[in-house]
Amino acid sequence: MTNQLIYKGKAKDIYSTKDENVIRTVYKDQATMLNGARKEAIDGKGALNNQISSLIFEKLNKAGVVTHYIEQISKNEQLNKKVDIIPLEVVLRNVTAGSFSKRFGVEEGRVLETPIVEFYYKNDDLNDPFINDEHVKFLGIVNDEEIAYLKGETRRINELLKGWFAQIGLNLIDFKLEFGFDQEGTIILADELSPDNCRLWDKNGNHMDKDVFRRDLGNLTDVYQVVLEKLIAL
């Protein structure tokens, strides 16, 4: 059925289209933290996230990364390939920050000699726990070969993103990716890429991401607008 709500999320709603293999993603004017425990309506945030994510996905597509992104169709909407989402959050860390610093008792801002890839099990009831490769296999999420692919593709995407953000004066601290299986059973990059799931610091160490909301550091949309303008100029 066309225009039927398929999924209602914290930051995005997903609808069916005339093509059973294509979905319409609507970005919402809402910020959340602590797995949705804190919610706040923020006017204009959805449009900013959509435009930023669209720009980044377009660049990734051109760079040869296979993604779900098709096109942006309005300020807060885009068309995507329909995928079966893998219930993993794949996090890559270039610099210590956030939960990593808290978990291991290290200060924020320490550059990691080798970027670290982490897995988190996407399960709201369990608060998305940190898991390792063996847990991933035990849960039957993906196999060894697919784990290796997810890690390798995440590291490749990291090198691309780091380079692009460096060109506009931003340091990519860490980011979260989600992948899914397309209609042919191929793993492709899905979800979004925006300051909601990319931790970005400027040259002075100022937060240019969702931490502005998490830590009450200022106006979130003002910060996201700066990131968007920088990406447009790239």
UniProtKB/Swiss-Prot annotation:
* Parts forming coiled coils: none
Q: Which InterPro entries match?
A: SAICAR_synt/ADE2_N, SAICAR_synt_PurC, SAICAR_synth, SAICAR_synthetase, SAICAR_synthetase_CS
* Keyword flag Ligase: yes
Top EC class of this enzyme: ligase
Gene Ontology biological process: 'de novo' IMP biosynthetic process; cobalamin biosynthetic process
EC no. given is 6.3.2.6
Pathway, per record: Purine metabolism; IMP biosynthesis via de novo pathway; 5-amino-1-(5-phospho-D-ribosyl)imidazole-4-carboxamide from 5-amino-1-(5-phospho-D-ribosyl)imidazole-4-carboxylate: step 1/2
Q: Does the keyword Ribosomal protein apply?
A: no
Regarding protein family, the annotation reads:
Belongs to the SAICAR synthetase family.
Among HAMAP family, the record links this protein to:
SAICAR_synth (MF_00137)
Q: What is this protein called?
A: Phosphoribosylaminoimidazole-succinocarboxamide synthase
Organism (species): Streptococcus pyogenes serotype M6 (strain ATCC BAA-946 / MGAS10394)
